């Protein structure tokens, strides 16, 4: 058993599908692992409430943090409020295997700081256009796993998945990425396999 839980940071632009991915991961992993979640919202606990409503986990396993401020920095820069939430969950549920920390915005300095996250997943979506990967940035280039979500929208927005694939390979320089569609579950098993492999998770 891990002495400390694996902490996986999930970041990405507003509306990219972070909460849908967090829900899918909870539903898929809750029978395998001792699991909890921290969500970050600006002035509400909307993401936490969404997870509770959809019965992702028992409500006491989900802590919603209200960060204040603008959506692009919707996780405190020093990560202290999130670290306190993680500590609270550790005290509440001794022997946790995994804590998912979902950022409320696309600011990466705290979400992806080593003190808060052991592994980082960055979610973008196809509706933002097929040029997004080549624009780069820390999330696209440096996250441990990049998830390109909502691939079902590609025909509707005129996005080329082939172009996104080649641009992403170039920008990430060998780091892994996954195309996903949370509505159908496409890509979810690859994401889970990555978390288990890279995080050295072993199911009880």
Curated annotation (Swiss-Prot):
Residues annotated for GTP binding in this entry: 12-19
Alphabetical UniProt keywords: Chaperone, Cytoplasm, GTP-binding, Nickel insertion, Nucleotide-binding
Protein name: Urease accessory protein UreG
Record NCBIfam families: ureG
Family: Belongs to the SIMIBI class G3E GTPase family. UreG subfamily.
Transmembrane segments: none
GO biological process terms held by the UniProt record: urea catabolic process
GO MF term (any one): GTPase activity
Domain of life (superkingdom): Bacteria
Annotated localization: Cytoplasm
InterPro entries given in the database record: CobW/HypB/UreG_nucleotide-bd (IPR003495), P-loop_NTPase (IPR027417), UreG (IPR004400)
Gene field: ureG
